[in-house]
Amino acid sequence: MIVLQAYIKVKPEKREEFLSEAQSLVQHSRAEEGNAQYDLFEKVGEENTFVMLEKWKDEAAMKFHNETAHFQGFVAKGKELLSAPLDVVRTELSE
């Protein structure tokens, strides 16, 4: 199992647009085969800082996700929504 935590800093004026885009991404990603979890949380005490928590069955499932239209669209849109580059932490859980 692959676990990704993506720390996302959003421009304050783009917050609502980001949340709308992220909600769509979460919905589509959860429907993918190989996805075990896909959730967005706002970091406590840090307004406009979010954590996307993803769990994938294996490398192939994660690779497939990274190539989907909904993920690629979110990444492209992120350039105008984010105030800092993504900080992604990857861990692997033994089964």
From Swiss-Prot:
Induction of expression: Strongly induced by stress due to exposure to 6-brom-2-vinyl-chroman-4-on (chromanon) and less strongly induced after exposure to 2-methylhydroquinone (2-MHQ) or catechol stress.
Boundaries of every ABM domain copy: 2-93
Gene Ontology terms, MF aspect: catalytic activity; monooxygenase activity
Keyword Oxidoreductase among UniProt keywords: yes
SUPFAM superfamilies associated with the record: Dimeric alpha+beta barrel
Keyword Phosphoprotein: yes
UniProt-listed InterPro entries: ABM_dom, AI-2_Isomerase_LsrG, Dimeric_a/b-barrel
Modified residues (Phosphoserine): S24
Class of this enzyme: oxidoreductase
EC number: 1.-.-.-
Gene Ontology biological process terms in this record: catabolic process; response to toxic substance
Key words, A-Z: Aromatic hydrocarbons catabolism, Detoxification, Monooxygenase, Oxidoreductase, Phosphoprotein
Organism superkingdom: Bacteria
Function field: Putative monooxygenase that may contribute to the degradation of aromatic compounds.
Family listed: Belongs to the LsrG family.
UniProt protein name: Putative monooxygenase YcnE
The organism of origin for this protein: Bacillus subtilis (strain 168)
Name of the coding gene: ycnE
